[in-house]
Amino acid sequence: MKYILSIDQGTTSSRAIVFDKHANIKGLAQKEFTQIYPQPSWVEHDPTEIWGSQLGVITEALANSRILPNEVDAIGITNQRETTVIWEKSTGKPIYNAIVWQDRRTAKICDQLTKEGKDKIILEKTGLVLDSYFSGTKILWILDNVEGARQKAENGELCFGTIDTWLLWNLTQKKVHATDYSNASRTLLLNIKTLEWDDELLKILNIPKAILPELKESSTIYGETDKSIFGAEIPIAGIAGDQFAATFGQACLKKGMAKNTYGTGCFLTVNIGKEPIINHERLLTSIAWGRKKTVTYVLEGSVFIGGAVIQWLRDGLEFFRKSSDAESLASSASDNGGVYFVPAFVGLGAPHWDSYARGTIIGITRGSTKAHITRAALESIAFQSFDILNTMKKSIPNFEIKELRVDGGASQNNLLMQFQADLLECKVVRPKITETTALGAAYLAGLASGYWQSAEEIISLWQVDKIFEPSMPKNQKEKLLENWNRAIERSKSWIQNSNSL
């Protein structure tokens, strides 16, 4: 019997999951790693710690599954996107910490480029808004702020990669420096129409082409693990950024299908087929995956703070000991008591894109309790997702959402899922296997290795766990949305001095 090993390198933890042919989980392991906050709005990770934690959980997951490395048919990698690592080619040593997707330090660089009109060129070529969220300005910052980095980059002595590339480099012991189209489409450097690194974009961001990885399809053989690591050479056969892997794992393989992942942030994607739609409503067009010599595009809205707001209530305010306790606490209040929570801790993502917004809890009275604030925090996740889907409806011709497939840790929260169905006025469907990000990476790897034969086989493996039907009266929903919109306007442009970022 053979299995697929999925590497799921996330924002707060490294995970590894072993799947069998029926997409059942045979074993898994997870390890949290250090979040580094050198200054307000700066977020970093130690790339060496990421690699070490990932290696540890792979070994543990295989042990938990009671399988040997030579029983693994192929490895799939999925990863937090945009997070940027630059390392020395000769030593493999990072020259700076990984700058995380949440990091806002390059907001001023983006402002300056926007003043110069570069945002329009970037949008047309990449499908992305010009924002510090993406890798491009993070690379620029490292090259300009680490001593000697720019000269080394010009000399071809450095490698850039998103986390998938960093893991691939280490798994193959420096043999493979590559990425897939989905991760590349989040760098501000890939032309999503030509599927090539774009010279004009590289010039705008002053980034030498020599540091960039090779571009490959998401479902293809990248190379093999070095024998020194697991004692076996295992094919690495699938790579996709986390939200794109989740879209694949949710079997949203047909045009018009939508999924929302409720993780650290929220990420709502709609499959828009084989042709990109460049969106002018501040949503993102990206490549979801490339396979069989074609690419599939998605329209995406990204919420920076989703489930992380519950982590903050747990760790920052100590409202409860476990994140899973949030639902029972929130349910102890019949409604939000007039409290609205805009968790703009690092600014606002789609469709607002305001780096200068900050968190707001509004509507508090003497009668407000921990339960009201927790409920408002949970509701904020659904409100932000509603804002995105509402914008998508305006952006995609004849788009009508019939169901939203959901996954991620917070999708286990029934209160949140019901509230989401009520706001969207559509079915919210949770699958039996909610590890859809890891599963998507496994599917991409297994299709490339021949473990699974076709997309139809993947679709047949998807199964429903629970369906949430909308039940809220329309006038109640409209009042909630009206107050949410008032709250979100209060949070915008809070920081007036950009040096405070």
From Swiss-Prot:
Task: State the SUPFAM superfamilies in the record.
Answer: Actin-like ATPase domain
Which molecular-function annotation in GO is an example for this chain?
A: ATP binding
Which top EC class is given?
A: transferase
Tell me which Gene3D superfamilies the record gives: 3.30.420.40
State where glycerol binds. 81-82, 133, 242-243
Instruction: Cite the CDD domains for this sequence.
Output: FGGY_EcGK_like
Q: Where does ATP bind?
A: 11-13, 264, 307, 311, 409
Q: Which residues bind sn-glycerol 3-phosphate?
A: 11, 81-82, 133, 242
Q: Is Hydrolase one of the keywords UniProt gives this record?
A: no
Under which pathway is this protein filed? Answer: Polyol metabolism; glycerol degradation via glycerol kinase pathway; sn-glycerol 3-phosphate from glycerol: step 1/1
Activity regulation information from UniProt: Inhibited by fructose 1,6-bisphosphate (FBP).
Chain positions recorded as ADP binding sites: 11, 15, 264, 307, 409, 413
User: Is the Transferase keyword given for this protein?
Assistant: yes
Supply the EC number(s).
2.7.1.30
GO:BP terms for this protein? glycerol catabolic process; glycerol metabolic process; glycerol-3-phosphate metabolic process
Highest rank taxon of the organism: Bacteria
Cite the entry's keywords alphabetically: ATP-binding, Glycerol metabolism, Kinase, Nucleotide-binding, Transferase
What's this protein's function? Key enzyme in the regulation of glycerol uptake and metabolism. Catalyzes the phosphorylation of glycerol to yield sn-glycerol 3-phosphate.
- The protein in question is named Glycerol kinase
